[in-house]
């Protein structure tokens, strides 16, 4: 696993913000100070794990780091930050927007609501505040998504199965709330917030309003 992480870190360093780079196994081997055969095996493993996508363009190997590969790096970053006692509070800034209108349905389900009360200590307003993150705060959002959070267990009712949810402590203008992520979800540039209060009304928010969320990756906020 150590070589996997080092390879991802090396590829990311070479790829930059676009997460894509043309690189041969020989070039990766030189960067990692390993044999070309080892580098080739690592690339195959990264591809098999879904951490990267490999394609050939003009006879050159192009490697793109996938979201799951980035998640590995962000989890490692969170762990190192915790060990070194860096601040565990992160600022998120984004624009309020409409969701799909499903928040009320899910938040009101007894299987979720009972756990919100027991594990989060809140009886949430039946709905979510949807926020589209500004580009310069995407790294912070990814860090939050890849921290442990408080786990809300999935459940079944007579009609269907409901998946687990991770909740992360946050505050908006001093109001206690939680950022929520479905357990099986890919990274998106939007996130949802739940609170005991109807945040749109409490904070007089309209679509497009820029809002600041102070979030925690260790649950202490």
Swiss-Prot record:
Function: Catalyzes the CTP-dependent phosphorylation of riboflavin (vitamin B2) to form flavin mononucleotide (FMN).
Gene Ontology MF annotations: metal ion binding; nucleotide binding; riboflavin kinase activity
Amino-acid positions noted as binding Mg(2+) in the UniProt annotation, renumbered to this chain: 128, 130
Cofactor: binding comment: Binds 1 Mg(2+) ion per subunit.
Region (Riboflavin kinase): 90-221
Reaction catalyzed: riboflavin + CTP = CDP + FMN + H(+)
Annotated positions binding CDP: 99-104, 197-200
Cofactor(s) the protein needs: Mg(2+)
Name of the protein this chain belongs to: Riboflavin kinase
Annotated binding of FMN, by residue: 185, 192
Pathway membership, UniProt: Cofactor biosynthesis; FMN biosynthesis; FMN from riboflavin (CTP route): step 1/1
This enzyme's EC code(s): 2.7.1.161
Entry keyword annotation includes Oxidoreductase: no
InterPro entries (UniProt xref): RibK_CTP-dep (IPR039063), Riboflavin_kinase_CTP-dep (IPR023602), Riboflavin_kinase_dom_sf (IPR023465), WH-like_DNA-bd_sf (IPR036388), WH_DNA-bd_sf (IPR036390)
Keywords: Flavoprotein, FMN, Kinase, Magnesium, Metal-binding, Nucleotide-binding, Transferase
Family designation: Belongs to the archaeal riboflavin kinase family.
Enzyme class: transferase
Sequence segments annotated as region (H-T-H motif-like): 1-89
One GO BP: FMN biosynthetic process
């Amino acid at each position: 696993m150590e070589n996997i992480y080092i390879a991802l870190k090396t590829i990311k360093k070479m790829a930059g913000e676009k997460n894509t780079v043309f690189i041969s196994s020989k070039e990766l081997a030189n960067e990692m100070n390993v044999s070309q055969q080892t580098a080739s095996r690592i690339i195959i493993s990264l591809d098999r794990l879904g951490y990267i996508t490999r394609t050939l363009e003009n006879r050159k190997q192009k490697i793109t780091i996938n979201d799951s590969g980035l998640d590995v790096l962000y989890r490692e970053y969170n762990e190192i930050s915790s060990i070194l006692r860096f601040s565990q509070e992160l600022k998120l800034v984004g624009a309020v927007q409409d969701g799909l209108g499903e928040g009320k349905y899910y938040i009101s389900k007894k299987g979720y609501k009972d756990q919100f009360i027991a594990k989060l200590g809140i009886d949430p307003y039946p709905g979510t505040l949807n926020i589209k993150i500004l580009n310069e705060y995407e790294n912070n959002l990814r860090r939050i998504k890849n921290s442990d959070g408080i786990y809300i267990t999935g459940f079944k009712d007579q009609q269907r199965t409901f998946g687990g949810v991770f909740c992360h402590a946050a505050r908006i203008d001093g109001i206690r709330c939680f950022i929520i992520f479905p357990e099986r979800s890919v990274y998106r540039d939007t996130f949802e917030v739940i609170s005991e209060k109807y945040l749109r009304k409490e904070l007089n928010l309209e679509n497009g309003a820029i809002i600041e969320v102070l979030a925690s990756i260790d649950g202490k906020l």
